[in-house]
Amino acid sequence: MERMIPIVFVAVAVSVGASAQGGRSAPPPLPLEPGASQADVDKALLAAPAALRDQATVIKWKSDFTYDTLRKGTNGLVCYDRSGYPLQQPFSVQCTSAANLSREAQNLKAEASGDRSKSEAMLKALEQDGTRAKPAFGSVWYHLSGPDRDHVSPHQMTVAVPGATEASLGLPEKRRETGAWIMNAGTSTAHIMIPGR
């Protein structure tokens, strides 16, 4: 009987601990795909909010604008490294909804020339002829970039609102440091800028 009391006490303590966490603990990080590098996965995940990180998918873009999956996730968020790509900072990681990967592939293809005016012209042409992939309305893009990992700008979040305008959202179209604003209003690129995080 003396041995049973400590076991019951431990079982009750574990049960109470689980209840305090909403009845379940956070799932462990997902396994990597064969051949994937933990360092590559960890770097891409730096852009993700901590609460979404362990269950996010991580991909690696290829030169043909397709990608390899380094880790399959379960929460719909996809993270990737854009460091050193044309028109990107030397350190640049990003996460967004899996629904936005076709759009990101178009972005990378347009930026491949390394010429900002050519890139913008290509994306504008896609917008005008109706072939520009639209982001999922309300989807979030998480960005972290800078000259190196130790000198990044504050996290930025943008929320895709394709077609939205100042009139439809009630947000200003002019940049402001103290709050959200809408950029590229009225286009498929329209998004809410949220400085800092």
Describe the role of every protein-language-model region.
Residues 23-197:
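Primary mode marks residue(s) on the alpha4-beta5-alpha5 output face of response regulator receiver
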